Amino acid sequence: MLLSPHEQERLLIHVAAGLARERRARGLRLNHPEATAIITSFLLEGARDGRGVADLMSAGRTVLTRDDVMEGVPEMLGEVQVEATFPDGTKLVTVHRPIP
């Protein structure tokens, strides 16, 4: 299977998010990269499903809570940005303070 660098990056995000979800299901608190992967994967899949940018920007703040992550992660994660592919093209989705 030949993947472009862009496709490899997206696949890596989804694999990392899957691992992070497994750790979360075992009761482990997530670190910065794991939290970022879960939120980014959520945004990419939401775009693929046809959700709007504004909807994803709002919903992206509900994916994880402070109880899901290690101490200090919400403060380190000031925003998550991803270029997501929507039915009408690629758009930048930015979620400010994704872990309120």
Swiss-Prot record:
InterPro entries membership: Urease_gamma, Urease_gamma/gamma-beta_su, Urease_gamma_sf, Urease_subunit
GO molecular function: nickel cation binding; urease activity
Enzyme Commission code: 3.5.1.5
Gene Ontology BP terms: urea catabolic process
Keywords assigned: Cytoplasm, Hydrolase
Any Gene Ontology CC annotation: cytoplasm
Pathway as given in its UniProt record: Nitrogen metabolism; urea degradation; CO(2) and NH(3) from urea (urease route): step 1/1
Pfam families from the UniProt entry: Urease_gamma
Signal peptide: none
Subcellular location: Cytoplasm
Reactions mediated catalytically: urea + 2 H2O + H(+) = hydrogencarbonate + 2 NH4(+)
Subunit structure: Heterotrimer of UreA (gamma), UreB (beta) and UreC (alpha) subunits. Three heterotrimers associate to form the active enzyme.
UniProt similarity note: Belongs to the urease gamma subunit family.
Protein name: Urease subunit gamma
Species annotation: Frankia casuarinae (strain DSM 45818 / CECT 9043 / HFP020203 / CcI3)
Gene (name only): ureA
